[in-house]
Amino acid sequence: MELVKIDINTPSHQAAIIELMNDYMLDEMGLGAPMKAGLAEKIIAGLKEQPNYLGFLYFDGNEFVALANCFVAFSTFKAKQLFNIHDYVVHQKYRGKGYGRSFLKAINDYGAEHDFCKITLEVRHDNPKAQRLYKSLNFEESNPPMYFWSAEL
């Protein structure tokens, strides 16, 4: 298995992002529906415009099996960069084989090697499998506990 840092201008990386995001959207933990027409192009164009985009793919020698779309931010409390894993998906046909764990471990190693102070992510309350995975790799609820809120615009 190989951790691949996404080059958003590479067509094979773009195709993998869209395939894996569609797989995520189809899942009950996503939207439970396929990607809407025209969204793929907007995703790639939008990511190209984000200077803080940091994406990873997991390559098994034949195909990309997992995706993490991350965004770099800055911790004012630690005066160091951090990154948030915004989307994390292992393709459905590769689940239950340890790819999720080894992929996240490789991402953690990347963060440590590149002097990030931490990695953040959000996880649905009704996704105990993901919660177990994250906890097993030393992720924990924020202390003090925090809410993740959003406002549609």
Describe every region a protein language model picked out:
Residues 4-80:
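Acetyl-CoA-dependent GNAT
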Residues 80-92:
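Conserved acetyl-CoA binding element of GNAT-fold acetyltransferases
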Residues 91-93, 97, 125-126:
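Active-site acidic-Proline motif in GNAT/NAT acetyltransferases
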Residues 94, 98-106:
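Conserved acetyl-CoA pyrophosphate-binding loop and the N-cap/start of the following alpha-helix
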Residues 101, 125-144, 151:
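Conserved active-site alpha-helix within GNAT-family acetyltransferase domains
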Residues 104, 111-122:
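Conserved GNAT acetyl-CoA-binding A-motif
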